[in-house]
Amino acid sequence: MSTISFTIFILANVWLLVVTTSIAQFVIDTSGEPVENDEDYFIRPAITGNGGSLTLVTRNSCPFNVGLDPDAPQGFAVLLSPFVSNREEDEVRLGRDLRVIFQAGTSCGQSTEWRLGERDATTGRRFIITGRDDSTVGSYGNFFRIVQTPSRGIFNIQWCPTEVCPSCKFECGTVGIVRENGKILLALDGSALPVAFQKE
């Protein structure tokens, strides 16, 4: 192999590595495109038969819980709003704190932004509810992050707002499900619910 051919081969591989690494830093949707923070997406369970579409679920009264509805064909779309916004970049990055907001209204007259609820006395789990944080967890309850699983295009959602408060000590957790009275609710502190993002 000539020196020029070898140099071209090395440069092509370095370029491919750089491109692959930069794409790997972003959340990608079901079409393989980076998820953008100004677009609506449906969050789908990556494992079919795992409960249906993400939606608002009534557990007791207001606020609504975030859950899955097997009878809802679409569920509600969400908007992802990063804690640190870069005006020149619309893509949602992996492992960065962000807000998850359902694009829907409620009869509770409150925000449909996801937040971490208090630990449930019966299940010991922390449910994902909606509304602006009322300082239940030091006003950091509305910040979640998306992390890659070993499978391309499949992610976990975590609550661990260390970007919002780097010096804080959080009891971090990954979002999973709880089945309660015929309802499927999202909660931390159990098995993870792998998800995919589908552009609306």
UniProtKB/Swiss-Prot annotation:
- Transmembrane stretches in the record are none
* One GO term describing the cellular component: apoplast
Query: In terms of domain of life, where is this protein from?
Result: Eukaryota
Q: Where is the signal peptide?
A: 1-24
Feature type site, description Important in determining the strength and specificity of the interaction with its subsrate: K169
Keyword Amino-acid biosynthesis included in the entry's annotation = no
Q: Chief localization class?
A: secreted
Q: Does the keyword Cytoplasm apply?
A: no
Q: Name one GO molecular function term.
A: serine-type endopeptidase inhibitor activity
Where's it found, cell-wise? Secreted; Secreted, Extracellular space, Apoplast
What's in the keyword line of the UniProt record? Answer: Apoplast, Disulfide bond, Protease inhibitor, Secreted, Serine protease inhibitor, Signal
Q: Which residue pairs form cystines in this protein?
A: C62-C108, C160-C172, C165-C168
Q: What is stated as this protein's family in its record? A: Belongs to the protease inhibitor I3 (leguminous Kunitz-type inhibitor) family.
Subunit field text: Interacts with SCP1.
Q: What is this protein called?
A: Kunitz type trypsin inhibitor 111
